[in-house]
């Protein structure tokens, strides 16, 4: 539902980049894309410790507040349904969802907000919306930090493709650990 709503919002944008039917997707490769993709192992090596510390600190905050620590339902849904369903969910989580979410959140929402709110404001607002729309209190802070990193990667590379790679790795690790 949330992706459909944001896709409709993004599709309603009236401005179009020259030569691009849907500029909000921003899926065109950029000149520095190879450099950005080559740096992904370093980005991942830096990200996972930051994510781990954020997740641990957030769990402590939630525990101190007496809040439940539950996994996202989407991670639990396929676990008892057999290998074909698990494989299908894994394909969606690693192959499809990162492309759609990065096109919507970094390619459309962040870029659109950046024009009016500047980079910092757009980064925080789009990251907060991204985290909220995952509908899970236990993962709110870690997903917010992930989204901030994805904005940094997007700004550094000028493309959503490195963000898609990082997002796919993140989803793959989470799906595997669930």
Placement of each model-derived feature along the sequence:
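Juxtamembrane helix-loop-helix connectors linking adjacent transmembrane helices
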Residues: 1, 16-97, 115
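Hydrophobic cores of alpha-helical transmembrane segments in multi-pass inner/ER membrane proteins
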Residues: 2-12, 160
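Structural signal for the C-terminal ends of transmembrane alpha-helices
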Residues: 10-19, 153-157
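Hydrophobic/aromatic residues in alpha-helical transmembrane segments
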Residues: 53-54, 96, 105, 109, ...
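Short helix-coil transition sites and intra-membrane helix breaks within transmembrane domains
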Residues: 97-102, 136-140
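Functionally important transmembrane alpha-helices
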Residues: 120-178
């Amino acid at each position: 539902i949330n992706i459909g709503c944001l896709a409709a919002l993004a599709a309603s944008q009236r401005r179009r980049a020259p030569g691009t039917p849907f500029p909000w997707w921003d899926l065109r490769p950029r000149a520095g894309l190879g450099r950005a993709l080559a740096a992904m192992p370093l980005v991942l090596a830096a990200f996972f410790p930051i994510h781990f510390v954020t997740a641990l600190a957030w769990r402590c905050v939630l525990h101190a507040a007496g809040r439940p620590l539950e996994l996202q339902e989407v991670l639990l849904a396929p676990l008892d349904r057999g290998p074909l369903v698990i494989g299908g969910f894994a394909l969606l989580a690693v192959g499809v969802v990162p492309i759609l979410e990065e096109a919507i959140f970094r390619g459309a929402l962040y870029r659109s907000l950046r024009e009016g709110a500047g980079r910092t404001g757009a980064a925080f607002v789009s990251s907060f919306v991204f985290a909220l729309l995952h509908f899970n209190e236990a993962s709110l802070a870690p997903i917010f930090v992930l989204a901030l990193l994805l904005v940094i990667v997007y700004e550094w590379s000028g493309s959503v493709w490195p963000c898609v790679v990082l997002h796919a790795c993140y989803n793959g690790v989470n799906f595997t650990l669930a």
